[in-house]
Amino acid sequence: MEMFQGLLLWLLLNTGGAWASRGPLRPLCRPINATLAAENEACPVCITFTTTICAGYCPSMVRVLPAALPPVPQPVCTYHELRFASIRLPGCPPGVDPMVSFPVALSCRCGPCRLSNSDCGGPRAQPLACDRPPLPGLLFL
């Protein structure tokens, strides 16, 4: 009987983890298309553009006794490989750099958040938007 209980526990633990990570409510960390905004205070317009960013679920843990042990670092969905692309803001006055660079995700991974190249905050209620009049969107993939 003990052997049967052990086997049942092993099956539940092993298949439960795989099922939870593949569920439709938890898409794994991957590149997705996102629309972002680019503007410069000195230029009269804002451009929205579509690029690829990293988004999705990364497995994490929370300690049962948080006061007794140091916190566990929580992984975030972040860039593994990326390249940079640039767009030119139209209508900028002379002497103002009209170029805006942005990252394009080629592949993603779950890892520690590095504030030097990632926004580690949670989901936003409102997407990043333009303060200036927008031009029609561009597509950069």
UniProtKB/Swiss-Prot annotation:
UniProt keyword list: Disulfide bond, Glycoprotein, Hormone, Secreted, Signal
SMART domains on file: GHB
Gene Ontology annotations for the cellular component aspect, listed alphabetically: cytoplasm; extracellular space
Leader sequence segment: 1-20
Stretches that traverse the bilayer: none
Matches recorded under SUPFAM superfamilies: Cystine-knot cytokines
Sugar-bearing residue positions: N33
InterPro entries found in the cross-reference section: Cystine-knot_cytokine, Glyco_hormone_CN, Gonadotropin_bsu, Gonadotropin_bsu_CS
Disulfide bridge positions per record: C29-C77, C43-C92, C46-C130, C54-C108, C58-C110, C113-C120
Gene Ontology MF term list: hormone activity
Compartment annotation: Secreted
GO biological process, one term: G protein-coupled receptor signaling pathway
Family membership: Belongs to the glycoprotein hormones subunit beta family.
Record's function text: Promotes spermatogenesis and ovulation by stimulating the testes and ovaries to synthesize steroids.
Subunit organization: Heterodimer of a common alpha chain and a unique beta chain which confers biological specificity to thyrotropin, lutropin, follitropin and gonadotropin.
Protein name per the record: Lutropin subunit beta
Lineage summary: Eukaryota, Metazoa, Chordata, Craniata, Vertebrata
Gene: LHB
